[in-house]
Amino acid sequence: MKIDILTLFPEMFVSPFNESIIKRAREQGIITINITNIRDFAQDRQQQVDDYPYGGGAGMVLKANVLGTAIEEVKGPDTWVLYMSPQGKPLNQDRVWELARRKELLIVCGHYEGIDERVMAMVDEEISIGDYILTGGELPAMVLVDAIARLIPGVLGDENSAMEESFSCSLLEYPQYTRPASYGEQEVPEVLLSGHHENIRRWRKKQSLLRTLLKRPDLLLKKCFDEEEKSLLEEILFHRENKR
């Protein structure tokens, strides 16, 4: 996959994209990430990229002729253009899977008060990472790239890891444990030490359902349950009812 990012602050991406799985994916040629400075497309000596908004108001707006030229220069015929914006559709795991199937992405990082509305005609999709305001689109872009990268074949060491993580099946991930088996007065659940793979699988499924019910019950409203999940959920609800 090829990912291009347009930003006024390219140095912000140096450390995050040169660590951990994204670094390995880039070194192996699985992902190509290009960071382009919007200021390189400024059209005056002062390299001005923003200006005061027509009609007055606070803040500055990224200029259409600068950002528009940058998008035209960087994007290819098959590029899907994304603009990180609090006005966009909320990002979720289903959307991440859809974006991970594309070959080329261009992520536009806004700044200041926003971008000239005329550039929006060049944007295919606006994406938000939450209902809060950040200084610019750089941090949301990093979140998006990290989420997408994990789903690309070859990036994670275990191909099943992405499928088993939280939200992949509209469920939160089951509890994880490692050595030592005893920590203070807390013990690792015996089933995980049993070596019985089927019992372990069923325990993890049940724990995922329980954890989702307790922490994110909204996720269960949109999930299609298989027969095993229905049975496990009934066990959970029966147990909770009897504890009252």
From Swiss-Prot:
This is tRNA (guanine-N(1)-)-methyltransferase. It comes from the Bacteria. Belongs to the RNA methyltransferase TrmD family. GO terms for cellular component: cytosol. One of its GO terms (biological process) is tRNA N1-guanine methylation. One of its GO terms (molecular function) is tRNA (guanine(37)-N1)-methyltransferase activity. Homodimer. HAMAP family: TrmD. It is found in: Cytoplasm. Its EC number is 2.1.1.228. SUPFAM superfamilies: alpha/beta knot. S-adenosyl-L-methionine binds at G110, I129, G130, D131, Y132, I133, L134. Pfam families: tRNA_m1G_MT. Specifically methylates guanosine-37 in various tRNAs. InterPro entries: Alpha/beta_knot_MTases, tRNA_m1G_MeTrfase_C_sf, tRNA_m1G_MeTrfase_TrmD, tRNA_m1G_MTases_N, tRNA_MeTrfase_TRMD/TRM10. It is an enzyme of class 2 (transferase).
